Amino acid sequence: MTKLVSTTYSENLDCRRLNVIFDLKEKDSNGNDAFTIFDESFNINVMIKKDHAVQISTQAIIEITNIDRELRNKLLAAFSLYKERTLQAPFVPVSVEIGRKSSQHLRRVFIGAVVTVDASMPPDIGVRFTCAESQNDRTIQIGTGPGTDIPQTGSFQDLCQYCADQLGLELVYHEELVAQNIQVPSYNVPYALSSLVPMLMSYNSFKIAAYIDDIYLIIRPFANAVNGPIYDINAETGMIGIPSFTESGVSFKCLADIPIPIAGGVRVTSIRNPGLDTTYITSGVVYRLESRGNEWSSEWKAYPSVLTVD
């Protein structure tokens, strides 16, 4: 495993921390898992886009510059399509963590796998990674029809749990849906894993949103935020600039390390645009992170919690 660590330097401010971790399956001389940490002399630029309106939408672009030839060659070699990598899954797991120097734990904002890698030409020695969420096996066929271990009738929660197990995810099932005890009269399991989440989204008569975020399959009523606190977003808590109206609600920009989840509740307060002051549910975000620059922000889209799906 290779861990790229970067911490900004400031005597007066709580320094930002940005970690990029590649699971390169390294081994030491004894055959044990090796863990390599590189210093902070290079630049890391990260752009992460999440949108729960589309099931396969979480992606990240990671640019690492100002690195020496040894590290550059090591990263490029790890993603070369050797014979064994074409026969096996040629995906290298990657995760991005952010936080502050004073925080004991960092927050993971992306987990996925490297899809493509490009090398920049000298003199700017660098590597650019394009990453996607960790659902590389979602096209695997799970059978030619419904399996014998899957009941053809039962609760919607059981169906969601089956889908989460097949995708290798943890199920987050909203407590309001638990209370409703939704029963599904009959269903057929799709042939490919990539069809599982769209299948769950097809139950619109229940006004349900189903999507993947991080390592979780989240099932919730469309008009309800995920369980958790409602975050106050204002000038004192980290809002950047002035929020604006959109066709579906609001867009606003804030510091990246505010732990807002997708479909989380936020309470926006703006002095310059008070007409937006209300509670929203987040629907998408773009993180822009720089280890040696000024960019450390997240741009959110959100809609009022009263919206429903017909």
Locations of regions flagged by a protein language model:
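Short beta-strands and strand-coil junctions in structured, solvent-facing domains, enriched
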Residues: 69-70, 103-104, 137-138, 203-209, ...
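Amphipathic, non-transmembrane alpha-helical segments in extracytoplasmic/periplasmic proteins
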Residues: 61-64, 71-79, 143-171, 188-212, ...
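Generic recognition of cysteine residues
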Residues: 15, 131, 160-163, 254
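Assembly/oligomerization scaffold segments
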Residues: 1-129, 293-295
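An acidic/polar, Gly/Ser/Thr-rich interaction patch typically located in mid-to-C-terminal regions
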Residues: 48-49, 53-85, 218-310
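Short, flexible loop/turn elements at secondary-structure junctions
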Residues: 100, 115-118, 133-135, 256, ...
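Short solvent-exposed strand/turn elements
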Residues: 125-142, 294-310
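Short beta-strand-centered interaction patches in the first periplasmic/extracellular domains
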Residues: 116, 121-138, 167-244
